[in-house]
Amino acid sequence: MPIQSTIFGLSGLSLTKSEKAFFRDANPWAFILFARNIKTPDQVKRLVNELRTCVGRDALVFIDQEGGRVQRLRPPHWTNYRPAGDFAALFKDNPTAAKRGVYLTMRLIADDLRSLGITADCAPVLDIPVPGADDIISDRAYGDSPKSVIPLAHAAMAGLASGGVAPVIKHIPGHGRATVDSHKALPHINTRLQELELTDFAPFNAFSDAPMAMTAHAVYTALDPNNPVTTSYDAITNFIRARFGFDGVLMSDDLDMKALSGDLTTLTENCLSAGCDIALQCSGVFPDMIKIAKGARACLLYTSPSPRDQRGSRMPSSA
């Protein structure tokens, strides 16, 4: 089986027999871990090795380790890192100290991840929250303006990269203006394109050379009034690819989120056909994983055993 254009989560602290068989057959491009998969450093190392053994290669292993509310590795075994919002506040008084603080924080996070064999972090958040928006982003953001978000995100990416961990910018082209949480419902954003390009879209445009990005499950009426970004050819291919010039690996946000509706197999096909390289499925719910894999089989994008042979000229080695 060629490498499939998917990233899968899993159910627990170790692989079940069914998961092992599924991963061997589906051959996903990468894996992602959550708090339910994490107990101790030694246990995580064993799990990461199990995952790579299933696919017979050094597949990338992802995690969300932003600091603040979103960090899967927590005390007592790991440090509880500050949220991005703390550095945004510091930036107002001392930009140099804020940038240095972000760099060092993400460098330490990279050390934590690499020690476990985890090679990609779904961070930094480039979204810019606005008054009245849902608080799903809030202090996960590096401020309320591109003037702080861009330099602080640059420091975050540099910190991760210097520790050998690949950053994933999110949620392209922006989620900060959403008035509902896309884990629960589909946001609709009706702001004019000219305003978006000066605000929400500016950080993503600035990092068009990033190695990886994750989509926003949101409808931008200025880009496509009928489809969320994740399944929109106009938003992904005609705007993110053509207008931003983003040529890195583009992964969806979790296809199991409530923002998206419909059959998971069809959603996967639509996501990949729209221009996403990778369909992400996080829940570890086995029937859902089977549906995602079925959809991806119809849209195989990767046929080489190395992600570096594809869009990934800027991708890290997993080893």
Name the predicted role of every residue range:
Residues 302-309:
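Conserved small/polar residues in nucleotide/adenosyl-binding loops
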Residues 54-79, 105-128, 157-173:
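Glycine-rich, aromatic-flanked loop segments that form ligand/cofactor-binding clefts
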Residues 40-43, 92-108, 147-151:
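Glycine-rich anion/phosphate-binding loops
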Residues 313-319:
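Hydrophobic alpha-helical segments, chiefly the membrane-spanning helices
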Residues 13-22, 106-109, 263-268:
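Short, acidic/polar
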Residues 8, 15, 36-54, 59, ...:
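Second-shell residues forming the walls of enzyme active-site clefts
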Residues 1-61, 65-77:
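N-terminal hydrophobic targeting/anchoring segments and the immediately downstream early-domain regions
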Residues 77-96, 141-143:
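A charged helix-plus-loop insertion that forms the helical arch/lid used to bind
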